[in-house]
Amino acid sequence: MSIRIIPQDELGSSEKRTADMIPPLLFPRLKNVYNRRAERLRELAENNPLGDYLRFAALIAHAQEVVLYDHPLRMDLTARIKDANDQGKPPLDIHVLPRDKHWHTLLHSMIAELKPEMSGPALAVIENLEKASEQELEQMASALFASDFASVSSDKAPLIWAALSLYWAQMASLIPGKARAEYGEARQYCPVCGSMPVSSMVQIGTTQGLRYLHCNLCETEWHVVRVKCSNCEQSRDLHYWSLENEQAAVKAESCGDCGTYLKILYQEKDPKVEAVADDLASLVLDARMEQEGFARSSINPFLFPGEGE
């Protein structure tokens, strides 16, 4: 199944009703997204061997929350939605969408917010990034979007990505349209921006029992049926792994066909699970999956592959 975003004026009344039944896309609702993530990261940091890094990630998430309200984004995306729909492309495609300098503003505001909380090597990284030219910032952004992770140091990548993510999430939240699921090209990437998922979540509430993949860039979620590999769409050789028991709120779904895995979080097991935070806090499960010979099909925005990985 592929997912297309249809401009509001092109949706018939029957399509509008259908789109409301099982939403193929859940556009980001940015109110409290970053505060909730920061709180969850701090909570998970307790008694976790990665506690210090989880608390560092929480500081970045909190800075995103502050900067989000200090620098709102206003733009009309109607024409872009129509063009993308005609071309069958994501409307905010990371590979073709021109980047506005707004994300530079977001980055420098985040740096200003973070500096008083930093010391030692972390402060040196932030100060070095603060001095980077616009060209250097754009080169790092392009490298990350091209998955050329060796070209961006692993200590700078999460900060660059955090600013880009906030920019893309602001744009995604302004999209004027609804989504329609269609048979066609497989869509293991975000239908809004083309980036990768960070994890998937089986939700509660109005989308009870439905699984949505969570974009690691624009914070959009898109529906993928359960018991199907989100990477290759096969279902014959899926297995579920956890570090606890069958009732664990965080599991890894592995696929023997393509040799990859993706975390799957269950809100019914723990309503507080958060797509980015719980994925980052369960790296021991990633190590286990690597031992079993599976490759990760997602990237956490706070942990990028380094050179040689």
Curated annotation (Swiss-Prot):
GO biological process: protein maturation
Keywords associated with the record: Cytoplasm
CDD domains per record: FdhE
Origin: domain of life: Bacteria
Localization, UniProt: Cytoplasm
Entry GO MF terms: ferric iron binding
GO annotations of cellular component type: cytosol
The UniProt record lists the keyword Cytoplasm: yes
InterPro entries with a match to the protein in the record: FdhE-like_sf (IPR024064), FdhE_C (IPR056796), FdhE_central (IPR056797), FdhE_N (IPR056774), Formate_DH_accessory (IPR006452)
Pfam family, one: FdhE_N
Family the UniProt entry places it in: Belongs to the FdhE family.
HAMAP family, sorted: FdeH
Chain's role: Necessary for formate dehydrogenase activity.
PANTHER family: PROTEIN FDHE (PTHR37689:SF1)
Record-given protein name: Protein FdhE
Organism: Salmonella dublin (strain CT_02021853)
Gene that produces this protein: fdhE
